[in-house]
Regions:
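An amphipathic alpha-helical micro-motif enriched in hydrophobic residues
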Residues: 27-40
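A short structural micro-motif
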Residues: 36, 54-58
């Protein structure tokens, strides 16, 4: 589990990468990132559950 400082680092890294991708490539970047993370996680059901958690309260 990440602590607050680590979460802030992850957030900053993600924000910088989204800026680098640019508005025309943001969706593609996020899909590629999600697929890479799913591969690292190695558990499709857990990925599906996390996806649903991320959709809550958008």
């Amino acid at each position: 589990m990440l602590d607050i400082a680590q979460l802030e680092t992850v957030y900053d890294t993600l924000a910088e990468a989204i800026d680098q991708a640019g508005p025309e490539k943001t969706e593609l970047f996020l899909v590629k990132l999600a697929l890479l993370q799913a591969q690292e996680l190695g558990h499709a059901q857990q990925f599906a559950e996390l996806t649903q958690r991320a959709l809550k309260d958008l």
